[in-house]
UniProtKB/Swiss-Prot annotation:
<protein>
    <recommendedName>
        <fullName>ClpXP adapter protein SpxH</fullName>
    </recommendedName>
</protein>
<dbReference type="Pfam" id="PF13743">
    <property type="entry name" value="Thioredoxin_5"/>
</dbReference>
<comment type="function">
    <text>Adapter protein required for efficient degradation of Spx by ClpXP under non-stress conditions. Interaction with Spx stabilizes Spx and exposes the C-terminus of Spx for recognition and proteolysis by ClpXP.</text>
</comment>
<dbReference type="InterPro" id="IPR036249">
    <property type="entry name" value="Thioredoxin-like_sf"/>
</dbReference>
<dbReference type="InterPro" id="IPR046404">
    <property type="entry name" value="Adapter_SpxH"/>
</dbReference>
<comment type="subunit">
    <text>Interacts with Spx.</text>
</comment>
<dbReference type="GO" id="GO:0005737">
    <property type="term" value="C:cytoplasm"/>
</dbReference>
<comment type="similarity">
    <text>Belongs to the SpxH family.</text>
</comment>
<keyword id="KW-0963">Cytoplasm</keyword>
Length: 297
């Protein structure tokens, strides 16, 4: 792993082809384990190619069970091709006890909570979502209640009082309804799904359903940008840990393309410096940053 002196992750200066910026939309159900497992792919893609695209999380699901019959899927407009495949290639979690009966749809309150957090900004929403997924998949919380959602808000360092106000607000409800409408328009039938569009073009977008190898996402991004793009150097390990706050050895090894053993040697050095705390959860090892949090960008 290359060592760099930079202390922050800064976006590089614009290149000649950046006027063809790309918008990416990640369609998720926060109770779906596959939607959690795709996060390392998104983090790595953002770190290496983030200057070429923006990304938004779109919460899929139904408002309640009574509306299931009226939730129809329309044919997608302006989508060139669809890759339909659902498979987990990397295996970031080995716990098979996630409550799949609840994972098939997103409870209304959880969806509203994510939208409420996003009202404080996309970064706030992403932090809240990751913290929520940690509770769900590492502690097998199958039915998150209001108390747990407030704990997630506190742990993700967003404004808890503002979050309380927004949780049942018309703004959060409207944001969730917009996500549902967009899900319909894009004909999302599998999650996670990632849709890429040119930001300033009427050209068709690209949709990929399921989880693929990292190279597939890079190739699709290059196809949309339509010029040679080079990955930015990955940040120092400490910067990544500080930004994510809580991450597994396997995720870090994937992001840096190193062996798990090599990564854990570096992580244990940081543990000796009291910068991280090692936490073993079931059959996976996680690392919690115990210094002050900084943002990715």
């Amino acid at each position: 792993m290359d060592k760099q002196e930079a202390k922050h992750i800064n976006m590089p200066s614009p290149s000649a082809c950046e006027h063809k910026s790309v918008e990416a939309y990640l369609f998720i159900d926060p109770l779906c384990k596959d939607c959690w497992e795709i996060e390392p792919f998104i983090i790595k893609l953002w770190l290496e190619y983030g200057k070429y695209f923006s990304i938004r999380h779109i919460v899929t699901g139904k408002v309640d069970g009574t509306n299931a019959s009226s939730h129809k899927w329309n044919k997608p407009a302006n989508i060139r091709f669809v890759w339909e495949k659902t498979t987990s290639l990397q295996g970031f979690s080995c716990d098979g006890k996630v409550h799949m009966q609840e994972a098939s749809s997103t409870p209304y309150l959880v969806s509203m909570a994510i939208k409420a957090a996003e009202l404080q900004g996309r970064k706030a929403g992403s932090k809240f979502l990751r913290k929520l997924q940690e509770y769900i998949f590492l502690e097998n919380v199958s039915n998150p209640d209001c108390e747990l959602l407030l704990a997630c808000a506190k742990d993700s360092n967003i404004d808890v009082e503002e979050f309380k106000k927004d949780l049942y607000s018309a703004s959060a409800k409207k944001a969730f309804q917009c996500d549902l409408k967009f899900t319909n328009e894009m004909h999302i039938t599998e999650i996670p799904s990632l849709v890429f569009f040119h930001a300033n073009s009427d050209e068709e977008g690209i949709k990929i359903a399921g989880t693929y190898s990292y190279d597939v996402y890079v190739q699709l991004l290059k196809e949309l940008v339509k010029c040679e793009i080079e990955p930015e150097p990955l940040p120092p390990l400490e910067v990544l840990l500080e930004a994510t706050q809580f991450i597994s050895s396997k995720e870090v090894a994937f992001i840096y393309d190193c062996s798990k053993q090599e990564i854990e040697r570096e992580l244990k050095k940081l543990q000796l410096k009291r910068k991280v705390q090692m936490i073993d959860v079931k059959c996976e090892r996680y690392w919690k940053w115990i210094a002050k949090e900084k943002d990715l960008v």
